[in-house]
Each structure stands twice: as structure tokens, then as C-alpha cells.
Amino acid sequence: MKKNNLKVVKINKTKSLFNYEKKVLIKELILGLKLGYFDFEKEKPQKVKFNLEVNYQDKQPSNDKDIKSIVNYAKIVKLIKKLVKNKHYNFLETLAEDVFDELFKDKRIDKITLQIEKLEIMKDLSLIHI
């Protein structure tokens, strides 16, 4: 009879090496903003819809008493509103880049999925998005 050689493997996992993966979803944030390259787009604010998925990691669990322990959805919405308040964007792509640049300042954020839609842009078209 063959004897099996079994080894006991001990795994130590320290909490300091553990990452908490978290996600913030913002759906259908609709704002009126100055956006567009063509003259007719510059005449008045346009309705634009934002959908975001922000993934982030943290070495600490969320603290229910400290809002700084999370990526705050209200802060993200406020940031987007601030970006579009006084600036005219010619292109959706430029607006998206500014949103990315601002959000990635938070080092916990490692991935952002952003969809921006121009609503009611043309008579025969329901929306344009990137």
C-alpha cells in the first residue's frame, strides 16, 4: 500500500492586506448645460443625462459615522454640477475627460464607467451619447 505524504498548509491573512472593493452607481442625473459645437447648440442649455459607475478600493471598512470613509455620491453629483455650471463644452468627450480628471483625484477610485447622453438634440433623433 502506498503511503500518502500530506502536508498541512497554514495561511495567514492580515487585515492590513485586505482590500474592500466598493461601487457607487449614479443613474439618470439630468442637467441643463451649455454643450455643443454648432451654433444652434450654443443658443440655449441642453438636457444632458449622466450615468456613472465608480469602482473604488479601500483598505478600511466603511465607518458608519464618517462620510469620508466612502466615495460620497452627493459629492460626485456636486462635482459634475460645478464642472458644467459656468463652462461651455463643445464636445461630450471633453466633458467626460474633465469628469474623469476630477474623480481620479481620489486615489481610492480605480475605475469609472461614464455615459453622457445629449437628449432632444435633433428632431429625428432621441439621443446622442458617448
Annotate the PLM regions.
Residues M1-I128:
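N-terminal, polar/charged subdomain of small-to-medium soluble alpha/beta proteins
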